Amino acid sequence: MTITPQEALQRTIEHREIFHDEMLHLMRLIMRGDMSPVMAAAIITGLRVKKETIGEIAAAATVMREFANHVEVQDNSNFVDIVGTGGDGSHTFNISTASMFIAAAAGAKVAKHGNRGVSSKSGSADVLDALGVNIDLQPDQVAASIAETGMGFMFAPNHHPAMKNIAAVRRELGVRTIFNILGPLTNPAGAPNQLMGVFHPDLVGIQVRVMQRLGAQHVLVVYGKDGMDEVSLGAATLVGELRDGQVHEYEIHPEDFGLQMVSNRTLKVENAEESRTMLLGALDNQPGVAREIVTLNAGTALYAANIAESIADGIQLAREAIASGKARAKVDELVRFTQQFKR
């Protein structure tokens, strides 16, 4: 027996869970454009108020993956996504995008899934565009990019066309909903390993268990206690780690890895051009907070990708990738490769 949107709304008002098959049905209605905007808005707001459960989020992510334009990657080994939910309000330069180049230089394959900035001054798509990367690739071209360069950027609108059916509702509501946390769960290339930053401490335990249900292999979900959706230099970082089917939650500190705890204030940018300058400075091995934070995050990503045995080992590999110039060379390689597909 399928649930009606009205019954689902009543369930959220009563703070009761919507079950897996029911959530699949409701999400398919939304993604097909078969639910009225009023009902869709009411249900996603109701879910937010009652707080979405692990089961509800996992079901919604399953449907988003169903409707996505997939990128077929042949070799899944050392394959990782580095992504944040955004919405942390920190307005820093694109740390996860910089980390992609370093991780690829150290031997990982990275499928980065991102968009233009909504809550930030510069989304991953904005800074890659500023670097000269052609972000508007077809799925087969992204697959070729991953095979050739070890990196592929999937511009969210190209891979999730069904999201247009809820876009106007989300825009008009103007508040966070379940869709803000679904993006990092719906990598179109199906990367089995992930470094995922989240905007709220409660999401650490939730998102890592959603990834567990979705069959991921090695995932680190992180929240910097200074509010960053990255591994932070300015505070301890909460970590939810999924490995070998088991979840462990713990805290890490910059000092654990011989790094100095420093404020992230100097990492703030106003636009994509400033983000580009800071990113290139870090990859050019210019000493400073930007280089240290991308080293820390890339090192964590290399651990998630199973290239490194530990975060500490990953940091060492990241340092070598920057110092050798290999990380900086990856920027030019991605620009060259993607520009051949310019339409």
Swiss-Prot record:
EC number in record: 2.4.2.18
Residues that bind anthranilate 2: R170
InterPro entries assigned to the protein according to its UniProt record, in alphabetical order: Anthranilate_Pribosyl_Tfrase (IPR005940), Glycosyl_Trfase_fam3 (IPR000312), Glycosyl_Trfase_fam3_N_dom (IPR017459), Glycosyl_Trfase_fam3_N_dom_sf (IPR036320), Nuc_phospho_transferase (IPR035902)
Glycosyltransferase found in the keyword field: yes
Single biological process term from Gene Ontology: L-tryptophan biosynthetic process
Listed GO MF terms: anthranilate phosphoribosyltransferase activity; magnesium ion binding
Binding-site residues for Mg(2+) 1, renumbered to this chain: S96, E230
Binding site for anthranilate 1: G84, N115
Sequence positions that bind 5-phospho-alpha-D-ribose 1-diphosphate: 84, 87-88, 92, 94-97, 112-120, 124
Cellular component, GO, one term: cytosol
Family: Belongs to the anthranilate phosphoribosyltransferase family.
Record NCBIfam families: trpD (TIGR01245)
Annotated function: Catalyzes the transfer of the phosphoribosyl group of 5-phosphorylribose-1-pyrophosphate (PRPP) to anthranilate to yield N-(5'-phosphoribosyl)-anthranilate (PRA).
Protein's UniProt name: Anthranilate phosphoribosyltransferase
